[in-house]
């Protein structure tokens, strides 16, 4: 049994080391819809990959990275709030992607179910290497840019006074998030990746009193959620990714039990 679920479990653990820190910054900056924007726009990236017969991973990575740059640029120049920009781009790119895929479905066989929900149990050794490399890149970037991104998150004006390049710090955070999502979508799915970015850090905040502890607890809770969700999926023969999200949500609710009573 363990041999069947081990690759998927290991993939989830490796992803946790990237989603934990990134999700924490996303919550601190109150841009939780950013993950939805990138994941929804990946549908358009999928349409492009089908049109040009390119591996969807590369088109999604390029497209989401490009979109992250555009979002940072628009946030810098426009007076509209970031949440408004994210909402407009999210639904526009999702709509365009769905229209493109529907037009191409007459000449291509397109199965969106795996893409929307993912399948963590179909991980190969090559996939594990990609996930490990991607998580390592994310952690390395965050390690070297920790002070500037944290200062930007705490107080943007203070960060500017301290000499932090605001545009570059924002771009770093959004690009690393784009890398993480483009890697995770294949295994977790478009509809659920944001949940894995948001729920564990939200739970971790209950037990933490510092940024470092929040990230540490977030990674730990992600690992617990992945482990519990995979076993739940295996024993009850239900989809893996929704099981992980549901398990993570239960952990969040149990952590808030004192407030709920």
Swiss-Prot record:
SUPFAM superfamilies: ABC transporter involved in vitamin B12 uptake, BtuC. One of its GO terms (biological process) is transmembrane transport. It is a multi-pass membrane protein. The keyword Acyltransferase does not apply. GO terms for cellular component: ATP-binding cassette (ABC) transporter complex. It holds the Pfam family ABC-3. The chain crosses the membrane at residues 8-28, 54-74, 84-104, 129-149, 179-199, 215-235, 238-254. InterPro entries: ABC_BtuC-like (IPR037294), ABC_TroCD (IPR001626). Gene3D superfamilies: ABC transporter involved in vitamin B12 uptake, BtuC. Keywords: Cell membrane, Ion transport, Membrane, Transmembrane, Transmembrane helix, Transport, Zinc, Zinc transport. It is found in: Cell membrane. Belongs to the ABC-3 integral membrane protein family. Involved in the high-affinity zinc uptake transport system. This is High-affinity zinc uptake system membrane protein ZnuB.
């Amino acid at each position: 049994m363990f041999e069947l679920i081990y690759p998927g479990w290991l993939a989830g653990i490796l992803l946790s080391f990237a989603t934990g820190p990134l999700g924490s910054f996303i919550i601190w900056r109150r841009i939780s819809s950013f993950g939805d924007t990138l994941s929804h726009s990946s549908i358009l990236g999928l349409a492009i990959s089908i049109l040009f017969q390119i591996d969807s991973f590369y088109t999604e990575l390029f497209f989401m990275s490009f979109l992250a740059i555009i979002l940072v640029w628009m946030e810098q120049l426009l007076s509209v709030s970031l949440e408004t920009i994210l909402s407009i781009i999210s639904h526009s790119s999702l709509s365009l992607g769905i229209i493109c895929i529907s037009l191409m479905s007459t000449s291509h066989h397109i199965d969106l179910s795996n893409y929307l929900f993912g399948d963590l149990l179909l991980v190969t050794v090559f996939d594990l290497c990609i996930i490990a490399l991607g998580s390592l890149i994310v952690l390395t970037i965050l390690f070297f840019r920790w002070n500037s991104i944290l200062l930007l998150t705490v107080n943007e004006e203070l960060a500017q006074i301290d000499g932090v390049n605001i545009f570059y710090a924002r771009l770093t955070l959004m690009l690393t998030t784009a890398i993480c999502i483009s890697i995770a979508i294949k295994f977790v799915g478009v509809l659920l990746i944001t949940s894995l970015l948001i729920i564990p850090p939200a739970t971790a905040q209950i037990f933490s009193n510092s940024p470092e502890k929040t990230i540490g607890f977030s990674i730990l809770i992600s690992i617990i959620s992945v482990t519990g969700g995979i076993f739940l999926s295996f024993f009850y023969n239900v989809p893996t990714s929704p099981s992980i999200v549901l398990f993570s949500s239960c952990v969040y609710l149990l952590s808030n039990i004192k407030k709920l009573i």
